[in-house]
Amino acid sequence: MLDLTNKESESSDNGNSKYEDSIDGREVGTSKPFKEERSLEDLQADLADMAVWMEGLDATKLPLNDPQLLCNGRAFSEVLHNVDKNFFTDGWLETMPENRTTNIMVFRSCTRKLWRKMFDYVNHINRTVVSSRWTDIHERIDGIYESDLPAMVNLGMAVVTLAHIGKNAKRFVDYSKALTSTHKSMMSNVAKMVTTVIDEMPENPCFHEISELHGSQSELNSLSESSGKLNGNGSSERRSNADQILVDAELEIERLRTETENQRKEIERLTKSFETAQHDMSSNSESGDISILEKQNEELRQKRRELEEKNLELDAAVDQFKGIVFELTNENDVLRRSDKERQRLQTVLDAAQSDLDEWKTVANQYQKEAELSKQQDKEIKELLSQNKALKSRLDHHVKSATLEDANKNGIAQLRTQVGGLTALNTELKASLDSKKRCVEQLEIQLIQHKEKVKELEDRKDELIEERNRLENQLIFKEAVTPRSLHESMFEAGNLSFEPFSEKNTLPLEIENKRLTERIQELESLEPLKGELITLKSKNGVLEEEKLFATKQIEELQQQIEDLQENLLKNQEHASGDVVGLKIQLEKAEVEAQQMREAKMRAETNQAQVDEILKKRTAELEVNATALQKAKAVIDELEYNSRPVSEDSMTSVQAFKEMKEENEKLRQKVEKLEIELNTVTQGFEQENRLLTSASHQQVLNRSIDEVMSMRAHAGSEEPQTLLDTQKMSGALPWRSLASETRRELPTAMASILVLGFLVFIAWMFININSALNAPPNA
């Protein structure tokens, strides 16, 4: 695999480097590094054309024409995943970051990771890289526009080319043909870039060509290196490939030896036949036979020379195979020693894997406990909401009870007022009744007096008429009858000597006396009329007082009825609220008991978690020690198997083996880090949940105490509203302070454990960075 992490390495698995090899078809010598001859405008146009081609695949939603956004490799990874999903798998795609950052180190790491996978795919499709364009990509990534644009254009060219030469090449070739009809100029530029990259990635020779190793030494070396490259995917696989090569070489040597022996036997046979022919020539003197024998002799000599040349070539091949066998034997010994170290490291990794399985089990337990904690948290939240509702209702009931007390006092005052008004109403009714009776008596007397007055007036009218009549008669008589002097004198002396006149005067006098008496009676009735008028005025005043008292009585009765209705409603509402409040208080007590039990379970779980955490901390320390030892062994192996100069024996296979094992260990460490982060986050979340639950339980406990005191308040002395409010406001803070003092050691222990976990994570990050550091040459 091409090593992009080591800038000082001058060789790769396929023999390509800054120096040209004989396999490139060029002379051996130093070559200049790749230089981009295109301008920035041309590169931007090329990237835009390739972006149009890749966007037509609908493989990604990320932008493909911005070089800075392409540096994280996610967009190219999604396109490659569409090119060959069997090689560029979903698991590998998930390892490519999706975040956008401007960190140059992240850019370089993502570019190296993407190119390593692309280079593996190039080997997978039996091709090799022969241009220095691809060996210094990391050198052109430094986070500025003028340098990351060429690198992203080159990677885009490689992605488009791999689509046209990969396993699913037919589909993408058809897609390009269909796209040519609408984007001719763009596809022409893309075709040029694909042709350039295909020339720089020729196909590899097959392994069966090793039978033609009678060629030059450089061809043998290149073939051996390419075979090592094609079969270098692990220490066990490389060792099996080396053993297979050694067996094939030994078989080839045996075959060559057998062929050499057969050729020697053929030479001896031909020599004997030549001697026999010479002996026959001495006995046979015919010229025709001699010429034939000479021709045969010449042919035999020519064949002998060819066989001798071939024998020399086979001897050279045997010597060459001896050197190869010696190198493979040494490499096999190194591989065996490395295999022992690998087995030892494998044992350590197996132990780490078992620890990882245990961690996974613990993580699953933590996850289950976290789910239970979430459920408990939901229940606690529901209980808190119910508690708040009950508390609000309790406050409402307290306020309503206070209002009811005030209403009761008002009702008592109103009842007192109603009693006074009722008594006053009774007195007024009694006085009214007495006055009514007086008025009735006065009315009766008035009626009687009115009747008498009417009778008297009638009698008076009759008498007046009678008097007037009599006066008229008297006047008439006087006018008709003349009087004598004697009568005049008699009248003057009030003497009457005539009996007739005495008879007429006597009734008149009697009537006159009667009238005089009647007049006197009437005059005596004048005070009664004044009294009657006075009684009438008093009667009017009493009537007005009666109406006012009746109206006031009706208003008081209406107020009494309203107050009685309000009193009944308040009594019914208060009785219903008291019953509901008692039920809710009982429910709250049951829920408080459940929460106390949940707190006990949580404390038990906390103790268990602390014990498990202590055990896992000790195991983490052991694993960290084992990882330090593994790192030391890896560093020692890398130091012992580092590449040396070209003119002495190298140990590239051992270096590749250590590098791959380092990669595996790095992946293991990353997995362990992920597991550690998951466990740490779960532990932190549990700590937060437990802390919040403990604080909430302290508050609930104080609320329960207040509610219990209120529930038992009926058996104690009655308290005023001000005392109740002071007590409900003072007790929760006192209990909260005491509970806070009790929970403070647990919080400090949680903080210490969290700090220790952060230190473990920091140590794993340092180990990972040390494992990923490039080896020194």
Curated annotation (Swiss-Prot):
Tissue: Expressed in the syncytial gonad, oocytes, and in all cells during the development of the early embryo.
Region (Interaction with dli-1), start-end ranges: 1-234
Main location (coarse class): nucleus
PROSITE patterns noted in UniProt: CH
Gene Ontology MF annotations: dynein light intermediate chain binding; microtubule binding
Transmembrane domains' residue ranges: 747-767
Xref: InterPro entries: CH_dom (IPR001715), CH_dom_sf (IPR036872), HOOK_N (IPR043936)
Segments forming domain Calponin-homology (CH): 44-169
Subcellular location: Nucleus membrane; Cytoplasm, Cytoskeleton, Microtubule organizing center, Centrosome; Cytoplasm, Cytoskeleton
Ranges where the record places region Disordered: 1-36, 217-242, 273-292
Consequence of changing Q44P: In ct350; temperature-sensitive allele. Induces aberrant centrosome attachment and nuclear positioning when transferred to nonpermissive temperature
Composition-biased stretches (Low complexity): 218-235
Coiled coil: 236-399, 425-688
Feature: compositional bias, Polar residues: 273-288
GO annotation, biological process: centrosome localization; chromosome segregation; cytoplasmic microtubule organization; cytoskeleton-dependent intracellular transport; embryo development ending in birth or egg hatching; nucleus localization; pronuclear migration
Domain of life (superkingdom): Eukaryota
One Pfam family per UniProt: HOOK_N
Region (Interaction with unc-84): 749-777
Induction info: Induced by DNA-damage.
Record Gene3D superfamilies: Calponin-like domain (1.10.418.10)
Bias (Basic and acidic residues) ranges: 1-10, 18-36
Role: Cytoskeletal linker protein, which is essential for attachment of the centrosome to the nucleus. Required for dynein localization to the nuclear envelope. Forms a LINC (LInker of Nucleoskeleton and Cytoskeleton) complex together with unc-84, that may be involved in DNA damage repair.
More details: In contrast to isoform a and isoform d, isoform b and isoform c contain a potential transmembrane domain which may mediate insertion into the nuclear membrane.
Quaternary structure, from the entry: Homodimer. Interacts with the dynein subunit dli-1 via its N-terminus. May interact with microtubules. Interacts with sut-2. Interacts (via C-terminus) with unc-84 (via C-terminus); the interaction is direct.
Family: Belongs to the hook family.
Name recorded for this polypeptide: Zygote defective protein 12
Organism the protein comes from: Caenorhabditis elegans
Protein's gene: zyg-12
